[in-house]
Amino acid sequence: MAQIGINAWVWSSPITTEELGRIAPIVAGMGFDLIEVPIESTTDLDYRKGAEIARSNKLAVSVCAAMGPDRDLIHPDESIRTNGMNYVRHCIDAAQTLGAENLVGPLYSAVGRTWQATPDERRRDLDLLVHQLRELAGYAGEHGVMLCVEPLNRFETSFLNLASQAVEVVDEVDHPACGILLDTFHMNIEERSIGDAIRAAGSRLRHFHTCENDRGAPGSGHVPWDEVAGACRDIGYTGPFVIESFTNKVKSIARAAAIWRSFAVSQDRLATDGLRYLRALL
């Protein structure tokens, strides 16, 4: 049976120790297998207590990086690059303590930063990212954590938009602790064929975000879910499928993710509808 999870951002932000303690029993009670924990501030969550919360609710864990303006592995400003590297190392340590196998997200640049680049400039940025990720993957591997690099849509980054671009990066990093996260919300915008994108990622695919075209519950929009499931079967994907959505009740996350309306009658309903659909699909 597929491992199905949900990101705690569906209900709240930031995810503090208290919020995780509130949300985890809800997630477990609904029948999810995994909770994805975003790390916004490095002081929000007591990771040892977080691990206890997850264990007591029989939930596996993944960790989601929040790449803000001062956390960017390829920024022209060296101090911002250094801060980004330190933040990702912190997330790796957090993942190990939480018992998470995967650290996921756009592990290259700040969300929302876009820029024009010549082919030579892009090659320079790629070389820098490969160097940075190779170092981080070494650290992650020592801590039993897999880095999962996520392409985003063109409105959130200009650097990695396609599965094929993530494949290029991961192949150049060439480290067993560096893989790919694909997200159907972003693929629906950028990929000409979602199935082909998944097949291109192949064995590099280690994490999967199941998001509807409007970031609502899977099955409520027009993402071609049969194509998604078929392609995942084609490549023998056995990793988690995680619902990632957001609440418009928390202004900071609503603004960051451009969430201006609700996608279901309640966040609980979004979660249960999505879980029911994915269980039937997968």
Regions found by a protein language model. Give the residues of each.
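Histidine-acidic metal/acid-base catalytic patches
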Residues: M1-A28, G99-E101, L160-L182, M187-L282
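Active-site-proximal loop/turn and secondary-structure-junction residues that shape catalytic pockets
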Residues: V10-S12, I39-S41, M67-P69, S109-V111, ...
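N-terminal substrate-binding region of glycoside hydrolase catalytic domains
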Residues: I23-D44, A65
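N-terminal small/glycine-rich loop or linker at the start of catalytic domains
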Residues: M1-W11, V63-H75, L107-A117
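A short acidic, helix-capping loop that chelates divalent metal ions and anchors anionic groups
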Residues: D70-H75, V111-Q116, F155-E156, I189, ...
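Conserved beta-strand positions in the central sheet of alpha/beta enzyme cores
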Residues: E36, S62-A65, V104, C148, ...
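Active-site acidic/histidine proton-transfer and metal-coordination neighborhood
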Residues: R55-S56, S79-G179, R261-R269
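Active-site-adjacent beta->alpha loops and helix N-cap segments on the catalytic face
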Residues: T43-I53
